[in-house]
Each structure stands twice: as structure tokens, then as C-alpha cells.
């Protein structure tokens, strides 16, 4: 127990150990190596008794991590409502913000802690309209995750539905609404043929006599004759009912009206009985245009005025016809109007449609089927536009918005945390690539050769090291899959010819592929993911990260947009990607999260680097125009100013990451010094042979020589920097590089960051870059002096920037 610190005991809920440590006078505000306080661990774990003990001993209730997260953030992340209550009772700030501008309410929503979020809103009085650094309110976050109960609670407590985030999106723009195929289409009921067949069935149920047949034949002959002579008079002669609306007559037939709309005939039967004469039946409830359209549908199954209109017009007339059909229980007419209105709903008229719908009686609205649903879905999906309309400002209130969300609740799917991610656009990738230093391009003759080798180099230098020995060359063994290596110009001495041929084939294939997620691309992407699942190194990426179960409570402090292979596979299976770019962005996001959160020396970091490199290489081979982005190391974590004691404790530890980083960078490229290369003079040749032997042995030596090499690297770096600066300022001829200077440059290359190593390899003549097995080798003696001068200039610039950053 003596070896257990207070933060450790609080993290694991060791109540008795905490009591013992507090009895010994342990400082309740001591931080661990991650700069988190004991109260953080107790809060996220839900150990309320430990929280109470710490607060009673004077724990800082609003203490924060380097990223600004307080114990209240941690309790909200874990859904620990009791701990939240206790912290707020002890004056915790319910609206405190972390480094990303997130309040505890935002944090609870980011972790899908629905009950906790509702408690913060309704019980603890959290401000529902505060924004994160990305401009998202709690309503944005709840909507993106499909958390209907939280959305309703937010709206009831004053959340604004028209506020926009930094991307100019209103909250409901990202509301996940999913409809099945059966819900998307609704069959129109009671076709004309069905209705007319009912009329014919009446004749089938009676015995036909010859007289009846003759009468029928005579009628048919009369109708045919009359239609041929004068169609206009046929309506009057053979119609048996006439309506008078606004002093205009409409002719009809009782049998057809009875078959098509029985309830309408029932409503006028009294008038027919009272009016034995042939006087027209007066209709006062409807306009002539409306009633004529009603009769038109009864006879033709369509309304000409409907067919000639567009989405932009006022649909009040169509609603009037629909209500008329609903009143007389004419299901076919209701279905016809409903489908027409559904197809006519657009961004410009959805507000006016909703204004009409919400005024309808509840019984009528229930008979509108999917029309109400489709109207609400269109309204929500065009929320950015709708919030700027006059209808929104004049006719929509808080209760309306709540009703909208409740009505859509059955179709809103709660989105898993792992699927919530930041949209990463091509502009962001372009911005990242522009920020990296780009050396002067070579002439067109070398650009051709540079095409394919550059692809190999990129993946090599972004590959994590899975060392099976101390040799740096073995570290890149897993960088290039065996299948893909056969298609690249590896193991070839004639690099130029193989590269140029590959370049031409690449350019021809690039014009034959589409970036849309068609069946061919979907099959390829599924193959990539299934291949990753089979690798043992992918176990850590196959499911979403559980911070509590895995003992990493700060995971969501660092990683705001989680992603995993299981989620990606699910989206592929459900056609969740529209383009290959979206798919690749998710895969890279998953591995970049691992590289950001984990230490360079950890197995997870190395596995992530290996898998990311393999993915980029295979993806690039299949989609030559989809260049992988330039991966930048994450920015350093901001830390508070340490005390004198902390500075003394950290003195010894700060040197370790530096040396580890150097060793890591040394493993990125295996540099080969060719002992058989021709040298300018015999003396230099002898000297080279000796030096090459030592260099060759050092490249495969054990880790015991790393410290000496690093010291030599520093000395050589200084001398080379001085010589290069004096040379550039005093000489006009090309500098000649000695063997020692070439080795010095080689050592300095290995000290660079991975991205800088990539740029160096882009500068070097591709003929000097060779691939042996699955590792890269640079022959320093095949690089001419002019090319070396470019390399040295870039290296000096990199070290200068590193010193400025320090």
C-alpha cells in the first residue's frame, strides 16, 4: 500500500487506502504524472464517498487538467449524476469550460450520457445556449447524436433552434433520420378500375333478362350515337344529377358518384329526395373551382390543375381538395392529394405547408399518413434555410419545435459515439500539405523517375517500427505488403525505366476510376477492412475505445472524434459512404487518433503506424490520384507552470523522450554507404573503405552505441552547419563534399522528424534511393554535390526551426 499514490487509489476506488493516506496527511491536491488531480479520478469513477472525503479535506472543486477539464467534466463524461450533485453542492461551476470550450453539458452529450445531460439541463441549470470552440451548442450535439429526450429538454429550457455553428449549420441540419423502404413509399388506394368494377359487380349479382339486355344495348347505342353527334349535350342528356355552385352548373351521374365516393352521395340524398324535380342541387360549402376539381377526380382519377403546378406555388388549394376527400372518406382522393403534396414539398414552401398542417384537427392530421412525417423531415433537413424564412419567425414557436422533434422520434436513430467525427475536407488536407516545407522541384527528367519511388518512400517513412532485432533496416519490414511490393519497382537496379513505366501505367489507370462508392470501389474498400481484421496488430482498433474499461479517463479530452474498424465496417455494409474519400478519411482518422493519444514507444502507436502506412500504399495503388495527406505530429499538450519541486523531478525524465525520439527517427530510413563506389582520389578511397566498414557495422549494431552516435551526430551537425554557411557566403563555385561530410549529412538525416525525412527523400535523386527487400537504402555516394547542397540547406533549415520551437 505504501507504493500506491492518492491519485491511483482514487482512480481504482480503493476507499480504505484513501482513508489511510489522508490520515497520514497526504495532499488531496497532488497531481499525478498526467497532471490530473485525485478528485478527477474519483469523479469519473463515481466513487461518491471518496469524492466526499476529498472535498471535506479541501480538494479544489474546480481544479483542471492541462486541457482544462474539471472534475465536473469527468463526472459528466462518466454519467455520474450523484457525483455531479455533490460537486455542484460544493460550488463547482456547472458552466465551466475546458480547452475546447466544452461545458460539462457538452461533455455529457459527446459521450451519449443522456440521463446525465437531462439532469444538467433540468436539475442543475446548465446554460443550454453556450457554444464550444467549434461553435456547437448542446442542441447541435444532441441533434447530431439523435438524442430525442435531450433535444426536447433543451428546447423546453430555452435552447435556440436557429443558432449556427462555425460551419453555418443550424442544429437540426445533422439530425440522423432513417426510413425503411416500406416507409418511403405509400400506395395510392382505390384505383379507378377498382371503383368502376364495384359498379359492374352490382349487375353480376342479379339475373339478366332479355329485356334487361336489350335496354342495356339500347342505352349503349344511344350513348355512342350521341357522343359522335354532340359530346357537349351528352352530359346533359345522360347525366341524372346537376349541381349549382356560384351560379354555374356541374353535371354528374349518380351511379358513378355512388361508386367513387359513397359518403358524398349520402350527404346529398336528403336534398335529392326533397327535390323530386330536375332542379339543380345547390352546393354552398365549396367554391365552383374546388367542386369542379372534385368531380374531375371522380371521373378521371386526376386533377389537371395539380399536374400543371410546381413546388414553388401555394399548396393551399391542394390541401382544400384533400380535406374535402377526407370529409367524405374518399380515400383515393386523399391518397392522390397526399402524394402530390409530398412530391411538391421543397425548401421554399415547407414552412407554409406546415402552417396549414398544424391548423388541422388532430383527427384529420392522423389520416394524412406519411405526409406530416415527410413535411417534418424536409423541414428539419433544410433547417438552415427554414430558420431564415418569415414562417419560422411568425408561425413557429417553442411548442411547435418540440412537437416536430417528438413526431420524428420514431425515425431518429441514436448515433454511437464512435460515429461522431469531425468532417475533414480536402481543403484541410491541402492546407496541411501547404504548411510543410517543399524543396525546389527537380527538372522534368528526374520528375519522371521520382513518381513511383516517391510513393514507396512516403509509406516507408510513415511506417511504425515492429522491430525483431536491433537493426534499423528491419524496422520497415512491415511497411510494404508482399502483394503490393510486386507491383512496385522494388528490387530493380534500373530504377529510371521501371519508374517511368509505372508512371505511365499509373496515369492511364487514374483516368479510368471513379471516386464514387460504386460496387467495384465498395468491394475494394471492404477487402481492405477485412484484411485489417485478420491482422493481429489490429485488435486494438476493432471496437470503440472504452475509456473507463481501459483505464484511460482522459481519452475524450484528447480525442474528440473517435473511430474504429467495427464502425467503418458497419458503414460499408450499410452503404454509409458516398465516396472513397469519405471512407479513407475515416480510416486515417482512426489511426491518427491512435498516433495522437499513444506514446511513440507503445505497441499501439507502432501498430497504428504500420497499418496506416499499409493502407495508404494499397489505397494509392488502386486510386493513383488520391494522394495520402501529410501527417503532422500533434501539437504539444499545454501544461501549467511547474513548481520548483516539479522541475527537479522532471529534469531526469525530459531527456528520455528526446533520446527515444532520436532512436525512433533513426529507424525510418536505412542509409547504405557503398564501399565499392569510385572516389576522387586514392587517399580518399582508402579512407572511405575504413569509414564504410565502421558505418556499416554501426547500422546493425546494438542499442549500446546509440549514445555515442548521438554525440557524434551533434558534433557533426555543428561542424557541417558552420562549413555550409561559410561556403554559401564566400564561394561562387559548387561546393565539393568530402566523405566525412556525406556521413555527417547521413547522420543528421536520421535525426530529423518523419515528415522532414520525407521531404529530404523527395529532394534526393531517386537513382540514389534503392529498395532492398522491404526497406529503403540511400547511397550517399551516388548523390552529386549540387543535390547534396540542396539536402544540406533543407536540413539546416529544419534544425534552425527546431531550435526556435524549443
UniProtKB/Swiss-Prot annotation:
Residue intervals of the Bromo domain: 516-622
Classification via Pfam families: Ank, Ank_2, BET, Bromodomain, BTB
Keyword vocabulary terms for this entry: ANK repeat, Bromodomain, Repeat
UniProt GO cellular component terms: chromatin; nucleus
Residues of the BTB domain: 239-307
Low complexity compositional bias, start-end: 426-436, 443-511, 642-658, 694-733
Positions of the UniProt region annotated as Disordered: 210-231, 423-517, 621-743
ANK repeats: 1-30, 34-63, 67-96, 100-130, 134-163
MF terms (GO), sorted A to Z: lysine-acetylated histone binding
Keyword Transcription: no
InterPro entries cross-referenced by the UniProt entry: Ankyrin_rpt (IPR002110), Ankyrin_rpt-contain_sf (IPR036770), Bromodomain (IPR001487), Bromodomain-like_sf (IPR036427), Bromodomain_CS (IPR018359), BTB/POZ_dom (IPR000210), NET_dom (IPR027353), NET_sf (IPR038336)
Pro residues bias spans: 626-641
Domain of life of the native organism: Eukaryota
Ribonucleoprotein is among the record's keywords: no
Positions with biased composition (Basic and acidic residues): 210-228, 666-675
Composition-biased stretches (Polar residues): 676-693
Gene3D superfamilies: 1.20.1270.220, Ankyrin repeat-containing domain (1.25.40.20), Bromodomain-like (1.20.920.10), Potassium Channel Kv1.1, Chain A (3.30.710.10)
Residue ranges annotated for the NET domain, each copy included: 727-806
One GO biological process term: chromatin remodeling
Protein name, per record: Ankyrin repeat, bromo and BTB domain-containing protein DDB_G0293800
Amino acid at each position: 500500500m505504501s507504493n500506491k499514490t492518492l491519485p491511483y487509489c482514487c482512480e481504482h476506488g480503493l476507499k480504505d487506502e484513501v482513508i489511510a493516506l489522508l490520515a497520514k496527511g497526504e495532499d488531496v491536491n497532488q497531481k499525478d504524472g498526467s497532471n490530473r488531480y485525485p478528485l478527477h479520478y474519483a469523479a469519473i469513477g463515481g466513487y461518491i464517498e471518496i469524492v466526499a472525503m476529498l472535498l471535506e479535506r479541501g480538494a479544489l472543486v474546480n481544479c483542471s487538467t492541462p486541457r482544462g477539464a474539471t472534475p465536473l467534466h469527468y463526472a459528466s463524461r462518466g454519467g455520474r449524476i450523484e457525483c455531479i450533485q455533490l460537486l455542484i453542492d460544493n460550488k463547482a461551476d456547472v458552466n465551466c469550460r475546458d480547452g475546447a470550450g466544452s461545458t460539462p453539458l457538452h461533455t455529457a452529450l459527446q459521450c451519449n450520457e443522456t440521463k446525465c445531460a437531462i439532469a444538467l439541463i433540468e436539475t442543475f441549470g446548465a446554460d443550454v445556449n453556450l457554444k464550444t470552440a467549434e461553435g456547437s451548442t448542446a442542441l447541435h450535439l444532441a441533434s447530431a447524436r439523435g438524442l430525442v429526450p435531450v433535444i426536447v429538454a433543451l428546447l423546453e429550457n430555452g435552447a435556440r433552434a436557429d443558432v449556427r455553428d462555425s460551419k453555418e449549420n443550424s442544429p437540426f441540419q445533422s439530425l440522423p433520420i432513417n426510413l425503411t423502404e416500406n416507409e418511403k413509399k405509400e400506395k395510392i388506394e382505390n384505383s379507378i378500375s377498382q371503383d368502376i368494377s364495384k359498379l359492374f359487380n352490382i349487375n353480376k349479382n342479379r339475373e339478366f333478362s332479355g329485356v334487361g339486355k336489350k335496354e342495356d344495348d339500347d342505352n349503349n347505342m344511344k350513348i355512342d350515337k350521341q357522343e359522335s353527334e354532340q359530346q357537349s349535350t351528352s352530359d346533359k342528356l345522360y347525366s341524372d344529377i346537376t349541381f349549382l355552385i356560384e351560379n354555374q352548373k356541374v353535371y354528374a351521374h349518380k351511379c358513378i358518384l355512388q361508386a367513387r365516393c359513397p359518403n358524398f352521395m349520402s350527404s346529398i340524398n336528403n336534398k335529392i329526395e326533397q327535390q323530386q324535380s330536375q332542379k339543380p342541387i345547390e352546393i354552398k360549402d365549396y367554391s365552383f373551382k374546388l367542386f369542379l376539381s372534385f368531380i374531375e377526380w371522380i371521373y378521371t382519377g386526376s386533377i389537371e390543375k395539380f399536374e400543371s403546378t410546381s413546388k414553388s406555388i401555394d399548396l393551399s388549394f391542394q390541401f382544400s381538395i384533400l380535406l374535402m376527400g377526407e370529409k367524405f372518406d374518399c380515400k383515393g382522393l386523399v391518397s392522390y392529394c397526399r402524394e402530390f403534396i409530398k412530391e411538391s414539398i421543397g425548401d421554399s414552401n415547407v414552412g407554409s405547408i406546415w402552417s396549414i398542417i398544424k391548423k388541422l384537427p388532430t383527427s384529420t392530421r392522423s389520416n394524412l399518413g406519411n405526409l406530416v412525417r415527410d413535411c417534418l423531415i424536409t423541414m428539419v433537413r433544410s433547417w438552415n434555410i427554414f430558420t431564415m424564412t418569415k414562417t419560422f419567425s411568425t408561425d413557429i414557436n417553442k411548442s411547435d419545435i418540440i412537437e416536430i422533434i417528438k413526431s420524428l422520434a420514431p425515425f431518429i436513430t441514436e448515433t454511437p459515439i464512435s460515429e461522431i467525427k469531425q468532417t475533414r475536407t480536402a481543403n484541410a488536407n491541402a492546407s496541411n500539405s501547404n504548411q510543410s516545407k517543399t524543396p525546389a522541384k527537380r527538372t522534368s527528367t528526374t520528375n519522371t523517375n521520382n513518381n513511383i519511388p516517391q510513393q514507396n518512400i512516403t509509406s516507408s517513412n510513415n511506417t511504425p517500427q515492429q522491430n525483431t532485432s536491433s537493426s534499423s533496416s528491419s524496422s520497415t519490414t512491415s511497411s510494404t505488403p508482399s502483394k503490393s511490393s510486386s507491383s512496385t519497382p522494388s528490387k530493380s537496379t534500373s530504377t529510371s525505366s521501371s519508374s517511368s513505366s509505372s508512371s505511365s501505367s499509373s496515369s492511364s489507370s487514374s483516368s479510368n476510376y471513379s471516386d464514387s462508392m460504386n460496387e467495384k470501389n465498395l468491394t475494394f474498400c471492404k477487402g481492405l477492412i477485412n484484411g485489417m481484421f485478420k491482422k493481429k496488430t489490429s485488435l486494438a482498433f476493432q471496437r470503440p475505445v472504452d475509456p473507463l474499461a481501459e483505464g484511460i479517463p482522459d481519452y475524450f479530452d484528447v480525442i474528440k472524434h473517435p473511430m474504429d474498424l467495427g464502425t467503418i465496417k458497419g458503414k460499408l455494409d450499410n452503404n454509409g459512404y458516398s465516396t472513397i474519400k469519405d471512407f479513407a478519411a475515416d480510416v486515417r482518422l482512426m489511426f491518427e487518433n491512435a498516433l495522437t493519444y499513444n506514446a511513440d514507444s507503445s505497441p499501439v502507436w507502432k501498430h497504428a503506424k504500420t497499418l496506416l502506412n499499409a493502407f495508404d500504399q494499397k489505397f494509392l495503388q488502386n486510386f493513383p490520384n488520391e494522394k495520402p495527406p501529410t501527417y503532422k505530429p500533434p501539437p504539444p499538450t499545454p501544461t501549467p507552470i511547474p513548481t520548483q519541486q516539479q522541475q527537479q523531478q522532471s529534469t531526469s525524465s525530459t531527456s528520455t523522450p528526446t533520446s527515444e525520439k532520436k532512436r525512433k527517427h533513426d529507424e525510418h530510413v536505412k542509409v547504405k554507404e557503398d564501399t565499392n563506389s569510385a572516389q576522387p582520389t586514392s587517399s580518399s578511397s582508402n579512407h572511405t573503405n575504413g569509414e564504410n566498414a565502421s558505418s556499416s557495422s554501426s547500422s546493425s549494431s546494438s542499442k549500446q552505441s546509440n549514445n555515442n552516435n548521438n554525440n557524434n551526430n551533434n558534433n557533426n551537425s555543428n561542424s557541417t552547419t558552420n562549413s555550409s554557411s561559410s561556403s554559401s557566403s564566400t564561394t561562387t563555385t559548387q561546393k565539393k563534399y568530402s566523405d566525412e561530410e556525406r556521413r555527417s549529412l547521413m547522420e543528421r538525416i536520421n535525426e530529423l522528424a518523419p515528415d522532414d525525412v520525407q521531404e529530404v527523400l523527395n529532394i534526393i535523386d531517386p537513382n540514389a534511393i534503392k529498395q532492398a527487400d522491404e526497406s529503403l537504402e540511400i547511397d550517399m555516394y551516388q548523390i552529386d554535390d549540387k543535390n547534396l547542397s540542396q539536402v544540406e540547406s533543407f536540413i539546416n533549415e529544419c534544425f534552425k526551426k527546431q531550435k526556435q520551437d524549443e
